[in-house]
Amino acid sequence: MQAMEGEVLLPALYEEEEEEEEEEEEVEEEEEQVQKGGSVGSLSVNKHRGLSLTETELEELRAQVLQLVAELEETRELAGQHEDDSLELQGLLEDERLASAQQAEVFTKQIQQLQGELRSLREEISLLEHEKESELKEIEQELHLAQAEIQSLRQAAEDSATEHESDIASLQEDLCRMQNELEDMERIRGDYEMEIASLRAEMEMKSSEPSGSLGLSDYSGLQEELQELRERYHFLNEEYRALQESNSSLTGQLADLESERTQRATERWLQSQTLSMTSAESQTSEMDFLEPDPEMQLLRQQLRDAEEQMHGMKNKCQELCCELEELQHHRQVSEEEQRRLQRELKCAQNEVLRFQTSHSVTQNEELKSRLCTLQKKYDTSQDEQNELLKMQLQLQTELRQLKVMKSTLVENQSEKELLCRLQKLHLQHQNVTCEKEKLLERQQQLQEELQCHEAELQHLRDTVASFKESNEKDTETHAQLQEMKQLYQASKDELERQKHMYDQLEQDLLLCQLELKELKASHPIPEDKGKCANKCDTLLSRLTELQEKYKASQKEMGQLQMEQCELLEDQRRMQEEQGQLQEELHRLTLPLPKSGLLLKSQELLTKLEDLCELQLLYQGMQEEQKKLIQNQDCVLKEQLEIHEELRRFKESHFQEVLENPDDSKLAKSSKCNRNKQSKLLMEQMQALQVMYDAGQAKQELLQQEQGRLLEERKRLQADLQLCLEEMQLLQVQSPSIKMSLESYGKSYGSMVPSNENCRKTYDTTVDDNESYYKSYTSTQTSSKSFLKSYDSSTSASEAYGKSYCTTSNSSITYKKSYGSTSSSDTCQKSFVSSCTDEEPAEPEDMERFEEMVVKVLIKLQAVQAMYQISQEEHSQLQEQMEKLLAKQKDLKEELDACEREFKECMECLEKPMAPQNDKNEIKELQTKLRELQLQYQASMDEQGRLLVVQEQLEGQLQCCQEELRQLREKRPSVVKEARGKNANKNMNKNANGVKMKKVTKPCSDTSESDLETRKSLEVVLYYKASQRKLDGLAKEEEKKEEMEEEKKQVKEEAKEQCGDELVAEPADPEEAKSTEDQEENEEDKEEEEKEEDSEEEEDDADSSLESPEENNPLRLSESKKSSPTPNPPIFSLPLVGLVVISALLWCWWAETSS
């Protein structure tokens, strides 16, 4: 802490001492000038007087001349060195300019490439938009056509409905006409009944008269007339019944309800008629019984014969009607079968249309076979229907013949007229039924067409829904884009915040410079108070305690590493034992097991259990290592807290110094105490360096151990490959090896990715070890200053923790992968050794042996499962733009396939469409097309958004380039202003005869300007950072390091030359300054390694500004003050140390602000 404060306050102390010494030297120089003027006057007087000079005066003059000559030679050497430095800086500046020009060319090429890609993407987007617009226009045209067809179909359906209604009205008129004719028939029957009643009344009157009065001739005539009337009545009644039944059957086909009503009326009339007939027959039977007559018997016989004939005709008509109904039922069944077959045919056609894009031959063959079978069924059903129609026509012709035969029996004119009317009505009914069937067929066709158009309309609605879904997806993607924009805005705000932070740091640096100038102008720094010393001592004690804790944790870490090495050795030993177990297991896998294998399998099981226990032990040790790493992190956090307390104490100490300035003598006394404290800190840092050396040695041992394990793994893989070849050669000899080979193939497939995993983890451990070495070297270079060494130690410990974690993980994965190799080797490695001839075992041993083999295989499978779990996590991700392009291509292909399917569906619409059950399949095709269109639209929208983001990024890149250019323009002006002031101060002080070691004040000013330029350069480099140029920058950095080493050598030589003149100073300040110079040189090396780019630009600026200072030294000195002595050197030796101190100040301010 005190060493750091000394480093911070050292420039102020030097400047105050130099001011005091300059004042004293000015007084002495004035006195010397007066003396020299007096001596010159005395010499001239003496010369005029002819007197000679004394020897003492000659010696003084000679000493002055020699001193002036020596100073002149030194100034010439320094001028030559500065000229060389200026040339080197000019070369570096030209290299930097070339690098910036090359970088600008690379940027322009990248911008041109991006612009070309943007143009190509815009052209693709325009083409896709044109295609989409054309597709939309085609779909709209198809929509208009479908709507026109739907309207025409609706008009046709309305026309058919009106025709159907007119047909129904005509049929209703015919029905009314038939009802009127039936009423006329009923009226005629009433007349006949009246005549019969009158005849019966006359007969009764005649029978009531005496029998004697009646003659046999009259009686016989009456009986004949009565018989004739009865026969006529019965015939007419039967004929009426037949006509009524035929009429009811015909009218029943038109209107079932009206036919039922007429049938009920006829049945009621028949019941009344039979009652009347039975009453009349009873009366006649009574009369016959009273007066039997042969003529009456003849009439009765004829009546019975006629009744039997009518019953026969009636039965035949009923049989024909039953056959006709059966044929109609069969026809309906055949029509239903035909419809079902048509539906199946349509389903098959739809399936064919659906799977036309598929490339599977088997599915196409199955569909063709199904279509052939359905076509055959349809043809058979058509043939059956044709046969049924022929049978129906034959039956109708037979029915007509029977009706014609029936009409021959009718002798009455009125009955013939009725039959003619009935035939006409029957023909009209047949015509009406045919027309009705035609209308039904037409109606079915119209319904099918209407269904097709409805399906098409549904398809169009689905397309509209798909467009809506695509719009929803567009909104979702827009929301995602907004989120990306927000993230980008957040990152941009973060960049602005960092830039603002850099600006604040620059402002703080300027304030610090102003405060330093005020301190230089006012009073020297006083000695610290007792309280501040006590606080510093307590903080140092806490720091030592934390370092001891850190050492203890490092020792524990080393012990854990040793235990890990022991575990690795145990693992190798278990590996050898596992190889022996594999050989024994191969002996067990033979088709005829040998005796004594049961014990070997038991030993194998015990060894596998030991291996599992060892793995669990290893995992426990890894958990302990993780806990120790966490404890180490806690210790580092405590160190960070102490560092913050130190920073706060330093700030408060600065404030106290500004508020309470004292004499300069106190500052000189406090310098010794700070030097002692800095020595203590140096010893502590050396102890830390020794500790880091030990850690590095341990890490190298671990790396060598891992390399040896990797070599052993490669050797085992080579042995495994040889065993596999031997197994393939011996496969022909025994069939049981096939099972072992299959299990080996599975285990080897799981082993290959585990090998890759092991290699990857080993590569990561090597990289982490390299990072650890880099960080450790950085700790070695920065071990002289507390802050730098602390930062590097924290980074080194973090890198060491990471590398240690990766080594532990790599050892775990290596162990897992080795377990997989050992489990897979069990199926092949010792097969050759198992071919030895031994005696076969007993059946009991065979059974036990099989059980043990099963257990061993289960154990090995469990070990393989553990390694497969770790392999599943390694999957590579593709870039988003490539995914989108691939997805776009797939969507284009699917869209083309859907367009082909749509065209085929439109062609199928011209053919007779499928029934209503096929709507589901058509809807599935429509939904699929809609999903494809949605995916295509989403991909197009996503591509457009990516293009927009790309344009925004290009615009931001241009803005960053403009800012970079502005910063470069501002930088030279600021540097020139600062350098002009510093050059004036340097020339004034050198003209007054200042010594070599006292030119620290202008150097501190130049360091301030260097800090300003460094801040601006860091802002520039922040924007110039590019991942693509890291390799080139690494090579350039190596060259620059060589150049800087040469410059350091030149500076050290200059320091050695000028060291003789610094002997006259007191001992303590010389020692303090020499140690500080060494620290500063080491810190300078560290800064040169970390910030080479920024220092190159600073050197360029220094060279550009120092060259005019060296060219015009006398003019600036003459403008200030004339001196009789020669020009002293412009730059002196402590310049490098002050530059390093200024760099440390800048780092301290950066850390406190962060």
Curated annotation (Swiss-Prot):
GO terms classed as biological process: acrosome assembly; single fertilization; spermatogenesis
Subcellular location: Cytoplasmic vesicle, Secretory vesicle, Acrosome membrane
Compositionally biased region (Acidic residues): 14-32, 1077-1109
Basic and acidic residues compositional bias, start-end: 1031-1058
Coiled-coil residue spans: 696-733, 859-974
Residues covered by region (Disordered): 1-48, 1031-1131
Membrane topology annotation: Single-pass membrane protein
Principal location listed in the UniProt entry: membrane
Organism domain of life: Eukaryota
Modified residues (Phosphoserine): S52
Organism in which the protein naturally occurs: Homo sapiens (Human)
TM region(s), chain numbering: 1130-1150
Misc: Restriction fragment length polymorphisms (RFLPs) in gastric cancer showed loss of 5 kb fragment in comparison with the corresponding normal tissue.
UniProt function note: May play a role in acrosome formation in spermatogenesis and in fertilization.
UniProt entry keywords in alphabetical sequence: Coiled coil, Cytoplasmic vesicle, Differentiation, Fertilization, Membrane, Phosphoprotein, Spermatogenesis, Transmembrane, Transmembrane helix
Distribution of this protein across tissues and organs: Expressed in gastric tissues. Down-regulated in gastric cancer.
InterPro entries reported for this sequence: Cent_Immune-Sig_Mod
Gene3D superfamilies reported for this sequence: 1.10.287.1490
GO cellular component, one term: acrosomal membrane
The protein, known as: Coiled-coil domain-containing protein 136
